[in-house]
Amino acid sequence: MSHPAQLTNGDLAIGLIARQVRSLVDWQAPVLADKDPEPLHQMRVSLRKLRVTLVQFGPLLRLSEPLSCRPLIKTGRRLGLARDLDVLQARLHDQLLPQLPVAEVELLQPVLRQLRRERHQAHGLACEQLRRASYLGWLAQMQRWLRHPRLTPLAHEPLADWLPQWQLVWLSTLFVHPAWRFEQLRKERQREQLHALRKQIKMARYQLDNCKPLLGRRSRQAIAVFKQMQELLGELNDLQVLQRALDDQLPGALASDLPQLHGLLLQGEDHCWQQWRTLAQSQASSQAYQQLLGALQHDRLRARLRRQSMNLYSSLHRAVFCDWRMVLQPR
């Protein structure tokens, strides 16, 4: 296997796509069997990563129209609905119910039954999508493409020369998103913008992670920070979704029917928000942007020097080998 510094743009892109397509195929049967919620989660992650990879490295790939991301988007939405319900149920059962008085637990039983019914229906829709000819045909076409990839000339250029460019598309918009600078969380519009920012952070993390073989310590630290921010905003969103779901299911208001649960949800939301604000204040600045851009440029330079030294070593090795052959050749 080639050293990362020797990879071309196409080497990296094809390797990522192949791994993610293989992951989708491997998770298909466990998701359909539905014996554990984890395969569904992992398949959804693989779908997202594949979509990000196809967009990120789109300039390298010659893909026919049938290989557009549309089937992936629809499949991801179906899996996402089931996954969201898994998360809601797990949060209620594992984290919240043990802290509630018996009266509130009893009042929640109809809500829990309704969530189970909705999750069963959502999983059925997800399975229906996974069995559709459009999705299975897309997978088959992508596997055929991987056997004989069609690439643009840019794919054959060294990855080390292009490392920052594969991040610039998201870097140009991520740090100027307005949701970084929200001081308080009051309006529904703000919640929607935070959810949109979370998606951008997730995309940034996946795109950085795609180039991880060539990344140094500072760039890898950025991946860890993005993951932490994504998880905090995800936690915040989950708590808000759960509150809305409970409001829809309960006969009265959440605050009056389930005061203990309502207090726990508000406490969790405030805790997430304070942690998020601390991180956001340290990251939403031109300095953080410049530091990450500088780290990527440094990674690019280091990878180029590594590639050049390896090429020089290989040339010297061949020259020495040829000289020895001449010395040992019978006269």
Where do the protein language model's features map onto the residues?
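Cationic, histidine-enriched alpha-helical/coil surfaces that engage anionic ligands
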Residues: M1-R331
